[in-house]
């Protein structure tokens, strides 16, 4: 009888420990880290975002609203380049001598990210996943500097990505972003076709980034305070 009672108590204790471990999935408010990748320009002097890809680096900060949603600040530094020789178009000003540029670009983007599944270590009783895909969109600012002129303009970043929780505090992310700028002068030339246009995105330049990032999570949430238990 005593042996059976002790066995029952031991079983209850083990189940309690397992349940506590299963629910032990800390959530953190903030992440900070860095990223590296490539940047490519698409505009009048480069017909494909896969041409002339240049290295870039970034600083990444993220505020986690909940396991599905977060806000991300991404500040990237890179290069964009292109040439009139890269496209088949005719440019009146460069009919005899080709035009080429190699500009430095700084981008600051603030986006809203939505995870398709709840993001976590996978130990959480809510069924959080350590690997999740996500989509995002927001607003950004672009500063491009080169030999022709310096340009400051707004951009609209849209993209997709995936992130993996390596450990409780360490995260790896991969994302691709297309930045639709509101300027046609990131390449240093406005309207090389000499054709008038109108509208916010009429004949404007864009650029894309492919980035791998590593971030560290901190500032744990009080789950009782946030009524998450």
Model-assigned labels for residue ranges:
Residues 1-27:
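Bacterial Sec-dependent N-terminal signal peptides
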Residues 21-62, 211-221:
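Short glycine/proline- and aromatic-enriched beta-strand/turn motifs that initiate or cap beta-hairpins
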Residues 27, 64-68, 117-119, 165-167, ...:
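Outer-membrane beta-barrel channels and translocator barrels
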Residues 28, 51-55, 104-108, 131, ...:
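Residues that define the transmembrane beta-barrel architecture of outer-membrane proteins
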Residues 34-38, 59-63, 110-114, 137-141, ...:
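Residues on the lipid-exposed face of transmembrane beta-strands in outer-membrane beta-barrel proteins
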Residues 45-49, 84-90, 123-127, 147-152, ...:
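Outer-membrane beta-barrel translocator domains and adjoining extracellular loop/strand segments
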Residues 67-148, 216:
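Gram-negative (and chloroplast) outer-membrane scaffold detector with strong preference
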Residues 105, 167-229:
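Predominantly the C-terminal beta-signal and adjacent terminal strand-loop region
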């Amino acid at each position: 009888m005593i042996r059976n009672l002790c066995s029952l108590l031991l079983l209850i204790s083990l189940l309690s420990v397992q349940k506590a471990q299963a629910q032990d999935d800390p959530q953190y408010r903030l992440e900070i880290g860095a990223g590296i990748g490539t940047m490519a320009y698409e505009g009048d002097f480069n017909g494909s975002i896969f041409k002339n890809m240049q290295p870039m680096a970034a600083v990444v900060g993220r505020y986690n609203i909940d396991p599905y949603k977060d806000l991300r600040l991404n500040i990237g530094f890179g290069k964009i380049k292109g040439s009139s020789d890269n496209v088949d178009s005719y440019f009146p000003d460069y009919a005899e001598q080709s035009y080429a540029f190699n500009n430095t670009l700084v981008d600051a983007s603030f986006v809203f990210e939505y995870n398709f599944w709840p993001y976590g270590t996978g130990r959480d009783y809510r069924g959080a996943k350590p690997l999740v895909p996500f989509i995002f969109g927001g607003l950004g600012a672009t500063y491009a500097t080169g030999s022709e002129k310096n340009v400051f303009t707004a951009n609209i970043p849209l993209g997709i990505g995936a992130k993996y929780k390596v450990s409780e505090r360490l995260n790896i992310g991969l994302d691709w972003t297309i930045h639709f700028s509101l300027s046609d002068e990131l390449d240093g030339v406005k309207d090389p076709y000499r054709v008038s246009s109108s509208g916010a995105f009429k004949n404007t330049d864009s650029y894309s980034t492919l980035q791998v990032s590593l971030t560290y999570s901190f500032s744990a949430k009080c789950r009782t305070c946030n009524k998450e238990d």
